[in-house]
């Protein structure tokens, strides 16, 4: 018998962590000698640390190669404790068999493994704090990265909790059980949470964890949160008077209003001004046929400066306002108020001395004067009051200056 026996090293996995290594005898294999040969005598193994080319002696690592006796024959094992292995290190295991007459295998059995006890890590950065349905579905903000320096990422898991009732998302509903859902992909992972499963004005907490190929599971989770907001803001136009002239019109603040938002807060306010006589819209410098939304000064309390020279006598104007919040919701039922610009004085009517309809030419009273008037009119804003004066000459005011009736 001059033919050597043969052996095979069988290491099931490429990567092991401490728990995985301890679960089973992980260095094992088979050996045999051909039929009609002397038969297998024993099997030895050599274990090399590939990071520094040292060999296991049975108790320590040495620069000299040591062949160590395995347990068994046709099926053999070798016990190497996890405490002898170093995180992040690859090991090469070789086997050689010897037969009954001393022939030694020269084409060694060979397999490798890498020991990995370092947890993977993940990142999660939800770009915004507030989302509405369109913003959430288009941004797909549940995504991030995962990394592992040794064995690589096997899977990424997502945990989603609803703050309003502490329930967890299970992929199609909300339940009391904490359920980690599988993310799509690994190194660049994502998770689809449809907006239809989100409730208005509710905060959601997201946690991410990864598992590497060696079975290490991340324990310091990446986390972030967001608030779902689909309620539009509210705004009002507050125009103090129904009618203005060039004296009481304030170009700085006659057009003003307020706005509010209960969840994400206000982002901006826009107003549009319609000239009702011809359906033209104010564009900021001139009137155009297309509606224009322009920004006033301020947000929660706002004003818009408009010179009275841009207003036309006898014409009414309608001012609309709409708010947009940080989540992107735009007010649909807009604020609205109107005013009319009136520069035309009332039309004078008839004034009669005395209390009768016929003008009185004389009076015998030395203590009282009386008068009546009629047919005064105003086509735009209407008449709200009268003043009278008394003079010793027509149109004079020397006896009594203008006094409100």
Residue ranges: model-predicted function:
Residues 1-9, 14, 99, 109-125, ...:
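Flexible, low-complexity linkers/stalks enriched in Thr/Pro that connect modular domains
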Residues 14-23, 129-138, 243-251, 358-366:
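Short, solvent-exposed loop/linker segments at the N-terminal edge
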Residues 30-35, 145-149, 258-262, 372-380:
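Acidic, Ser/Thr
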Residues 55-75, 167-190, 280-301, 387-405:
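Recognizes extended acidic, P/S/T-rich segments that occur
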